[in-house]
Amino acid sequence: MKTQIEQAREGIITPQMAAVAAEEHVSPEYVCRMVAEGKVVIPWNHVRAPKAVGIGKGLRTKVNASIGTSSDIVDYEAEVRKARAAQESGADTLMELSVGGDLDRVRREVIAAVDLPVGNVPLYQAFCEAARKYGDPNRLDPEMLFDLIERQCADGMAFMAVHCGINLYTIERLRRQGYRYGGLVSKGGVSMVGWMMANGRENPLYEQFDRVVGILKKYDTVLSLGNGLRAGAIHDSSDRAQIQELLINCELAEMGREMGCQMLVEGPGHVPLDEVEGNIQLQKRMSGGAPYYMLGPISTDVAPGFDHITAAIGAAQSSRFGADLICYITPAEHLALPNEEDVRQGVKAARVAAYIGDMNKYPEKGRERDREMSKARRDLDWQRQFELALYPEDARAIRASRTPEDEATCTMCGDFCASRGAGRLFAGDLRGDKV
């Protein structure tokens, strides 16, 4: 069975490409061309057939929500509820990142609970199983890892974050650098680095990259090139280790595309705002325009409890400058395993950020909704305001909780409503359109 990218290169518009085109209000031919060039990916798996979602050039910036158990908290029903909450709140994709309990069970229950494309990180389960079996994760047999990747794809994974870009040279780059204020913050990355150092061997995911691609190609699963050496602090952003891994991942993205696999490149998670544009330009240039998956990014390290906001600020910038997929961050980041409400807040913040970014990335089509909202506010048309809101129910609930005496106004201004005053002063004079 041919993959989306292989069919696109033959000029075949698949049902998934047609569905993406209809959702995005672009032509099927455009989607087909972008998939063929590797500038758009459609997370997919013929075993499960999730909702078709396009990620990449010329399309709306998408939002991913990550859930999963930890070694401290294992509640399968809670993870299913979080998955559903993410979908209800507007997430476009979902990553199941459990490291505690029965990992096959939670993955399968989450996949069954939503129709979104679901992704994961195979290294998590691989090292968990090695630790349980041998008492030491560094005794992981690479064959066990490849078997696990196959098993997870067979369960219906639509995309998979695989840490192929860590190799012995990137580790040496990190060591020569002589500092890392935030250390290593990728669970999969630090586990693979530990395995490589303990065994004195190359990363099997890098060494046998063609084997990884072969497995994912069989299912048409998107290969998302994970960033195990990403910066976990803004003062580590764009350091040599991070850029070295990005360089390798961009090379691998090109190789994977040539082999007929859809490729996604992952970006960093902590980036000061002045470095966002350059980071994205570098990735796009080196990868040949592969879709870029930014993990936030968090734009300051001193606001725990509010990292859904710090990440939303970074995400708006990322979307504006060309990032294609944003991973949400919840208020619980750096503090605790997120609960259902954290998930909802994280998705909503990321969606608002992505919308703001798209307004600037696609100004010709991204601002009409805002113009209509402005007119509805000017005219005190509350029903129209709710219809245009990104989250109508949230807006309705706030207004209903503080009912004004005059239904035309709100309790912020009441009798001193500026919109009503302007309407009386200028009547129909302000209802024209800008030339």
Swiss-Prot record:
Substrate binds at M95, Y124, H163, S186, K187, G188, N227, G228, L229, R230, E266, Y293. This is 5-hydroxybenzimidazole synthase. The gene is bzaF. Gene3D superfamilies: 6.10.250.620, Radical SAM ThiC family, central domain. Homodimer. Keywords: 4Fe-4S, Cobalamin biosynthesis, Iron, Iron-sulfur, Lyase, Metal-binding, S-adenosyl-L-methionine, Zinc. [4Fe-4S] cluster binds at C410, C413, C417. Binds 1 [4Fe-4S] cluster per subunit. The cluster is coordinated with 3 cysteines and an exchangeable S-adenosyl-L-methionine. GO terms for molecular function: 4 iron, 4 sulfur cluster binding; lyase activity; metal ion binding. Its EC number is 4.1.99.23. It holds the Pfam family ThiC_Rad_SAM.
